[in-house]
Regions:
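N-terminal targeting leaders
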Residues: 2-190
């Protein structure tokens, strides 16, 4: 009995080991790990950002001073508050015309009326407070999130690592005094 049972036990042990190895392969994350951006790509992105900002600042219709420009792997994100749809459309058109731009995300928001000097100052203070809160939070990369405020509405933009970081940034911003609402227009890094 022991001589015939041994091959059976050995076969069962081998099958169990192979099944364990097969199941171990199922424990992989759904999303591939983020590909690191090379120093050359970061430099290219910085040049693209500078060229887009320059194009926005020198255009008569666009008022690029109120527009945040973020670039990652040639993808440009425009965010902030503009006076009207024509200005937003023009800024997108200008960004698309810059050499090296592969695509443009339009996260520009239309202002709802004129702001008083006091309201602009209040918005500036809120922006600084939110930016500071994001910088000191250990779960967000505040240096990679742009913050713009108009009449207490805070817009977050830029490229973040995960949906968890997006949610955390929104939560941090909402808890800042003076924030009426938060629009999170960040995108997940590809």
């Amino acid at each position: 009995m022991t001589t015939q049972a041994r091959p059976l036990q050995l076969g069962i042990a081998i099958a169990a080991a192979l099944a364990g190895l097969a199941l171990a392969g199922c424990n992989k994350p759904d999303t591939p790990p983020e590909q690191k951006v090379s120093a050359g790509t970061e430099l290219d992105d910085a040049v693209i950002t500078t060229k887009v900002k320059s194009a926005l600042m020198t255009d008569n219709l666009g008022k690029g001073g109120d527009t945040s420009v973020e670039t990652r792997k040639g993808e440009v994100m425009l965010s902030g508050f503009v006076d009207n749809q024509a200005q937003a459309d023009r800024e997108v058109q200008l960004a698309k015309a810059v050499d090296g731009v592969s695509s443009v995300q339009n996260k520009l928001m239309i202002k709802d009326g004129k702001s008083t000097a006091g309201a602009v100052l209040d918005d500036s203070v809120v922006t600084v407070k939110v930016k500071s809160a994001l910088m000191t939070d250990d779960q967000t990369k505040g240096t990679e999130i742009a913050v713009t405020t108009n009449k207490g509405v805070v817009q977050l933009s830029g490229f973040v690592d995960s949906t968890d970081e997006q949610a955390r940034a929104t939560s941090v911003a909402r808890n800042v005094e003076g924030v009426q609402s938060v629009v999170n227009d960040t995108s997940i890094k590809k």
